[in-house]
Regions:
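N-terminal Rossmann NAD(P)H-binding glycine-rich loop of SDR-like oxidoreductase domains
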Residues: 3-22
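Glycine-rich Rossmann NAD(P)(H)-binding loop
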Residues: 6, 146, 170-175, 202-210, ...
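NAD(P)-cofactor binding segment of oxidoreductase domains
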Residues: 57-103, 109, 113, 123-128
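Short-chain dehydrogenase/reductase
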Residues: 101-126, 151-155, 175-179, 209
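Conserved beta-loop-beta element that borders a ligand/cofactor-binding pocket
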Residues: 126-148
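Alpha-helical substrate-binding/gating segment
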Residues: 158-168, 175-210
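Mid/C-terminal beta-alpha module of Rossmann-like enzyme folds, strongest
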Residues: 192-248, 281, 287-290, 294-298
Length: 299
């Protein structure tokens, strides 16, 4: 297949481009500000200034990894020539935090006060796409992790483990987190392209969540380390020392499992993530968690 991937230089879009390039002809659309992956064809252009750049291409699939709002989708659709299937990577942030959980695809979407404009913009992008593209799919992942993850999430815990630090846990550490390995997401997009199911919107993610404590234990275990926990009172801002908001949610992924009944174990996914991290530390966008911990929590 001839596939267009938006982005292609960082984490989700880069992994996606390299994953599909193994067996397909892959083009990436980006502004050329970062290094390009080997084995892909780079189209260096702003998605908002496409002109006729893409008109000469006929893509079997468009994987829109970097669409964040209605304008992003509108401008890309307007710049494309003929194409087959359009897959838009949306987010769990489209579900209001006030709705009962687990969230299902049929549930009404709306503003989530935790995610704010990010979720609202994804909603507007989804609606424009479904109104203007006949063969489109939308996937809504929870927290993505795995190889090439440049966000300071598991990488932060890995560094705590490397330095034999105690880990500072929000409250009692029982808040649950739902993850999805980036390779599993690519596998599912591949299934959508191959099987073309009638359903158009899918929640994706691991069928089971983990508590904060369980997640940290898994990260330390990846390095063969045992963690020591320190529990932090709720009056201290959680994002000052921990990579996730104080917000627990869960996506129902039964429809995904009907098409892809196995997902990668967290143990395996974290092992692959750490192997990448060790060789690509400079790629990670660090936050000042250590500074806050050392100044305000350890003292």
């Amino acid at each position: 297949m001839k596939i267009l991937v938006t982005g292609g230089t960082v984490f989700v879009s880069r992994f996606t481009a390299e994953y599909f390039a193994k067996n397909n002809e892959v083009y990436v659309l980006n502004r050329g500000t970062k290094s390009q992956s080997e084995g892909v064809h780079a189209i260096v252009c702003d998605r908002h200034e496409l002109g006729d750049t893409l008109k000469k291409h006929e893509f079997d699939a468009v994987l829109d990894i970097c669409g964040y709002n209605e304008t992003d989708v509108r401008d890309l659709l307007g710049g494309l020539g003929n194409f087959g299937t359009y897959i838009f990577v949306s987010s769990s942030a489209v579900y209001p935090e006030t709705r009962s959980q687990p969230f299902r695809e049929k549930d009404e979407i709306g503003e989530n006060k935790i995610w704010g404009d990010y979720g609202v913009n994804k909603i507007n992008a989804e609606r424009f796409l479904m109104a203007n593209c006949k063969n489109a799919y939308i996937i809504r992942p929870p927290y993505l992790y795995g190889k090439m993850n440049n966000l300071y999430r598991e990488a932060f815990v890995f560094e705590c483990a490397e330095q034999n630090r105690p880990f500072f846990v929000p409250r009692d550490g029982k808040m649950r987190l739902q993850f999805f390995d980036i390779e599993d997401m690519c596998r599912f997009m591949e299934i959508l392209l191959e099987q073309q199911p009638k359903q158009r919107v899918f929640n994706v993610g691991n069928p089971e969540s983990v508590s904060v404590i369980e997640w940290v234990e898994l990260c330390y275990k990846t390095l063969g380390k045992t963690q020591e926990f320190r529990f932090v009172e709720p009056n201290i801002e959680q994002r000052s020392y921990f990579p996730f908001y104080n917000y627990e949610y869960f996506l129902n992924v039964e429809k995904m499992l009907e098409l892809m009944n196995e997902t990668k174990s967290m143990e395996e996914g974290l092992k692959q993530s750490y192997a990448w991290f060790k060789d690509n530390r400079a790629e990670v966008r660090r936050k000042s968690y250590f500074e806050f911990i050392d100044k305000d929590l350890r003292g």
